Every structure is written in structure tokens, then in C-alpha cells.
Curated annotation (Swiss-Prot):
Enzyme Commission code(s) on record: 2.1.1.249
Keywords, in A-Z order: Methanogenesis, Methyltransferase, Pyrrolysine, Transferase
Entry's Gene Ontology molecular function annotations: dimethylamine methyltransferase activity
Recorded family membership: Belongs to the dimethylamine methyltransferase family.
Pathway: One-carbon metabolism; methanogenesis from dimethylamine
Protein's UniProt name: Dimethylamine methyltransferase MtbB2
NCBIfam families on file: dimeth_PyL
Amino acid sequence: MATEYALRMGDGKRVFLTKEKIMAEIEAGTANAADLGDIPALNDNEMDKLAEILMMPGKTVSVEQGMEIPVTHDIGTIRLDGDQGNSGVGIPSSRLVGCMMHERAFGADTMELGHIDYSFKPVKPVVSNECQAMEVCQQNMIIPLFYGAMPNMGLYYTPDGPFENPGDLMKLFKIDKAKESMEHAAEHLTRDTVWVMQKLFASGADGVNFDTTGAAGDGDMYGTLYAIQALRKEFPDMYIEAGMAGEMVLGMHGELEYDGVRLAGSWPHEQAPLIAKAGANVFGPVCNTNTSKTSAWNLARAVTFIKAAVEASPIPCHVNMGMGVGGIPMLETPPIDAVTRASKAMVEIAGVDGIOIGVGDPMGMPISHIMASGMTGIRAAGDLVARMEFSKNMRIGEAKEYVAKKLGVDKMDLVDEHVMRELREELDIGIITSVPGAAKGIAAKMNIEKLLDIKINSCNLFRKQIA
């Protein structure tokens, strides 16, 4: 009897497949992506590599040593303190505690602060509260800390917002009015997002994470692109990450363009240059998981799309890898075996510069991804590499080289806890364990500024406060 390997379906259910069946699923998945996106399918060596990863006997797998990448986040601390029947585990804790847990306990390379409703529009009435939370977090933390939220243009339509719902108008065949409503909503999305981030950046935020860009279609992406453009013009040093909602931008409007390119129907490799043109530092491409297909099919398809996006992108790519995207099953508690295999494949085959850790419980998401692929933050040098990707748009190889040179170590040492523990204490750039007298928070970041020859926003704010 042929050997069968334990894989997953797109909904997380375990399934057993032979090597021949796995290869057939991989071929079908990559062919599907190649056909839809008009991009190259994976070659024989890449398909063999993917099959090898999927058939590895261990429950968890990880990238080869030296291939680790920094991680960013969607939903921030909500995966800890949130309790809405999805992936939040309902631990009563402050957002400061949640952010510091990610930095000190999970080994995150970056982190983000976010409102419980996690959209820009609901932040407006409570922006002062968000600014205070950001200031307190920045005073205590070392890793880059973003403000994260969804553009979520749907909130601008009735009954939640001021503009008529385009879906209702389309049902009445009022197509022009529907388009007009989307255009107005996009303008308000841009305005609100810029206003919120003006306040947060003035409070020390390292930058912004636009999560699920394009969720309401091309109007949503249109408004977000112009928000990025405006923020980049006003704040040249702001870290900006733009992650997508889906693999293809839905043409709800159908005629909106950015830089002369129609947004509707664009795939990850076509979205990347637009995100870069607008002024983002990092692009977060997405590939949706099909719950009725195997993990072999889903992962092959996702790696094919993301590999093409990485090659087409002028800026670093942090693939979105929460539940239901990036070849990961659609399950609130994502299976660790599936998560770590997807993480490894994205790094070693697609060549991503980082991973945006998305929705899922703490064990299934940040812990699994960081164990499989992450640089472990201030346990080593993950925060430093992440800062170079965002401050200078460096791809992963260049960022590692730059940081290694500044530290006077080999690139392999950047993830070596033994080397970096001693070096971080010697340079006083922040360490993960509590040592009396060692630089923490702003003090550590000021030393990082000197080391990497960059400016950090929270340090600039502190200097203004004591001037």
C-alpha cells in the first residue's frame, strides 16, 4: 500500500494523500494561479520542494537557518484581549501589556496597536485615547510599533455612514449613482485615514498598517492609495505597510484608476507597483484559501501568486498569512502543521521579505510563524532588520547585510541568541530580559538610531518634549 501523508483541507480538516496525489494537487494549484494571473507556474524543482515541505514528518517545520525574515501583524493585541467568538482568546489585559507580550514573550520583530473595532472611521471619536495609548507603548517598547486599522469603506454607506449603499442602488439599476456614492466614500476614507494618522504620528507611532485594503472593492483601494500618497508627502519618514484584502481587486466601480492603471481586476503582481508608487514601504500581497481544496492545492496556488508579486514589487513584500489566506486553512485555531509549512514555503520558494501575521489564536499565528520563520525580535536582531526594510525600503538580503555590517557580525549571527544577547547589552540597544540599568524604551531606541544611522519617530517626539 502506498504511503499516505497527513495534510489539511482548506477548512483545516485532516486528510491523507499519497505522494502522487500531492504532486497532482500542487500541479493543479499552480496551474490555476498561472492561468488566472497570466504568470509563470512553479517549475519542477519548486514543485518538488513544495511537496518535500508538505511531506516532512514533523508536526512543525521551519526555514533553513539563515533564511529567517521579520514579521509584521494584523489585528494587534485583539488576538489576546478580543473575545468575539472568532480568534481572540479573551484574556483581560491592557493593550500595553498585549504589545509588550508580543515583544518580550512571543519574540515579535514588530507590533501594532489597534482599536477594538479595527477600522479607521470608528477611531475618530476616540483618537485622543488612541494617541495616549500609543505614547505609553512607545515609551516602554523597543520594536517598531505601528497603528493598524482597516480602511473599511463599507462603513461609509448606509446604515453606518452618510452615503447610499451602492449595492442597493445597483439593484435599482442606478449604476451612475452607485459609482458616485463609491467616489464620495473613497474621498472620505482618504480624509479620515490621513487625519487619524496625523494624530497618531504626532504621538510617536512608527507608522501605519493598512489592513485588508480593497475589502469593499476598487473604491476602497483607490481611497487607500491616495491616503498613502498624502501621508508619504506629509511624513517622509513614516513607516507604511499596505496589506490587501484579497488576491484580486473586485470591480465594484469598475473604472477607477491610479497612475493610469485600472484597479478593478488587478492581481498581486499588478497591485505591488501601485502600492509602491503611492509611497508605501512594504506591500502585503494576499492569496485566498479555498476551503474545499487541499493544503497542497492552496499552498501551491498561493506561492505561485506571491512569488510573482515579490518579483514584480519594487518594495519589500510581507505576505499576509492569517487564517484563510496564504495557503493557511480557514479556522480560528489554525493547525500548527499547516501554518509552519505555509510559512516555510513562502520564505524558501516565494522569496518573501517578511510575513504579516494575521487573524488566528496566539499559538496558531504569532507563535507558530515566529517559530517557523521569524527573526525573534529583540531576542536577536529582528527589530533592527525590520527597521531597515521600513526606513529604507531594503529587501531582506540588503537589510540583513546592512545590519550585520553595522553590528560587526556575520548575517547568521543576526538570529543567534547567544551572540545577540551579549551584543545588545554591550551596545545598550535593548534586551529581552529585565536587567537593572540597561537602556529600555526610548533610551534603547535612541541608541538604535545611532547604530543604524536612522531616525525613529518616538525619539523625535521625546527630543521635542525635552527641548
